[in-house]
């Protein structure tokens, strides 16, 4: 995929994040079967990012990038492999109910759930390009974990990075080439 394509995906993803009210009522994720690949990221029939793991265990590039980004940004609160912590939920369980649009709304808008039993707060990541430029990849990784298609730990094998991925990533992040 060329730089424009990746940038369009990132902008569309950010735009979806602000559709918050409608996103709250979206259906849970459906069949994760991959049907289309764009720039290393696979999508299901509904257009949500998904994983493509081959019989020999090779993980698609987007899911592998999602693993790397998750571990650099989300792990501190949500624990290794999305398994949760004493103060942040298990995302492998949450993604069994969260659609892609709900996931984006939660990540971009943050979450605040305060009651007599708990005080949970997740900040907004809407302006964090290290998150929003790779939100589809992070979702794909967590989706693979939530369905049991991908085990714990670093994937042993990954597909090669697709042509133009680095350039598109740098552009989204605002890094000159």
Per-region residue spans from a language model:
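Bacterial N-terminal signal peptides that target proteins for export
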Residues: 2-11
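Bacterial N-terminal signal peptides
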Residues: 12-20
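Boundary at the C-terminal end of the N-terminal hydrophobic targeting segment
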Residues: 22-26
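Flexible coil segments in periplasmic/lumen-exposed cytochrome c-class electron-transfer proteins
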Residues: 29-52, 117-177
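Active-site Tyr-X3-Lys motif and surrounding loop/helix of classical short-chain dehydrogenase/reductase
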Residues: 64-68
């Amino acid at each position: 995929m060329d730089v424009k394509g990746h940038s369009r995906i990132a902008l569309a993803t950010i735009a979806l994040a602000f559709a918050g009210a409608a996103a709250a009522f979206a259906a849970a994720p459906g069949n994760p079967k991959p049907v289309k690949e764009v720039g290393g990221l696979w999508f299901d029939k509904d257009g949500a990012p998904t994983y493509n793991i081959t019989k020999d265990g090779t993980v698609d590039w987007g899911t592998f990038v999602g693993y790397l980004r998750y571990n650099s940004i989300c792990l501190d609160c949500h624990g290794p492999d999305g398994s949760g912590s004493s103060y942040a939920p298990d995302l492998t369980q949450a993604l069994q109910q969260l659609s892609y649009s709900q996931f984006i709304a939660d990540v971009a808008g943050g979450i605040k759930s305060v009651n007599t039993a708990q005080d949970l707060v997740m900040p907004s990541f809407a302006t964090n390009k290290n998150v929003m430029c790779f939100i589809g990849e992070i979702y794909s990784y967590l989706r693979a974990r939530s369905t049991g298609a991908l085990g714990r730990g670093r994937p042993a094998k990954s597909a090669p990075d697709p042509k133009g991925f680095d350039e598109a990533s740098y552009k989204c992040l605002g890094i000159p080439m």
